[in-house]
Amino acid sequence: MDALITGLGLLESPRWQNGRLWVADWTAGLIRAIDPAGRVEVVLEHQSLPMCFDFLPAAGGLVLTSSSQRALLRLSADGTLSRYADLSVLSPHGPNDVVIDGRGNTYVNNVNFDFAAGPPAGDPAPGFVALASPGSARVVADDLAFPNGMAVTADNATLIVAESYRHRLTAFDIGADGSLSNRRVWAEVGDHSPDGICLDRDGAAWYADVADRCCVRVREGGEVLDRVQLDRAAFACMLGGNDRRTLFVVAAHWPGPQNLMHHTEWDGTVLAVPVLVPGAGWPGRGSGG
């Protein structure tokens, strides 16, 4: 395990695109692109907590969540930032994670409470997944307990959502119009609370776990196939590199949700772990080099 870069903020949403790892630095309000030598380019400055993003097909730019605007924004290849979809009619709270499949279906989820203020007392309102397109969005799955990382299988047939508060990965069939059906438990993960996820060519999923400071590879049904233990919280993971056989993990020491807005001494790190089975599906499939 090697550190690609250290000394950043709270990192999330790793994506492999055009030979570089792109990450959202939540505390700095930046999207950064990091090459294999550790050189960093700041791609966008945007204050949002959470802030996650993914890439549209065919060089269509990227789409990012904006919590303050309760919207999805689009960053075009020429650097223009515009509104992609208004999400304010779906919830009084801002969106969380986003994934875009190979057909351009844009799925965005919402934990349905004020993330920056921390979890509410008692049982929070259930979260949901919405399908967004330019100018519109509609809920396609609800009753999700803190929906977090999402991934789509390589055949564009299945969306997998990490339900952090139910300690499971939940799957849906994707219809021709992008709608979701046939909800099912894809994997129970014990007492872990899965955060960011990605998929590999064997059909297994990697998930990051904050509290247990690890990344775990599981197959459908929940069998644990591999585990990478860290010295700090793991927030998300991405299979990248030229052969997609590097597991990139974004990690930092976690001060707890109650201290998120006040913590200043972040030690955000991107770790690189070689693996045998390459990545597949989305995010990340066919994203250039």
Question: Model features per residue range: what roles?
Answer:
Residues M238-G289:
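Blade-level signature of beta-propeller repeat domains, shared across WD40, Kelch, NHL, RCC1
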Residues L30-R32, A71-L73, G127-A130, R168-T170, ...:
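A short loop-to-beta-strand structural motif that recurs across blades of beta-propeller domains
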Residues I5-R20, H46-S66, S88-T106, N112-D114, ...:
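Beta-rich, blade/repeat-based domains predominating
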Residues M1-G7, P36-G38, R183, V273-L276, ...:
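A short helix->beta-strand "capping" segment at the edge of beta-propeller domains
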Residues W26, S67-S68, V111-F113, S164, ...:
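Short loop/turn segments immediately following the C-termini of beta-strands
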Residues V108-P124, A252-W266:
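Short, conserved, GDST-rich strand-edge loop motifs in beta-rich repeat architectures
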Residues F172-S179, V275-A280:
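Short loop/turn segments immediately following beta-strands, especially the blade-tip
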Residues M1-I5, G38-E45, L81-S88, S136-D142, ...:
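A short beta-strand motif characteristic of beta-propeller blades
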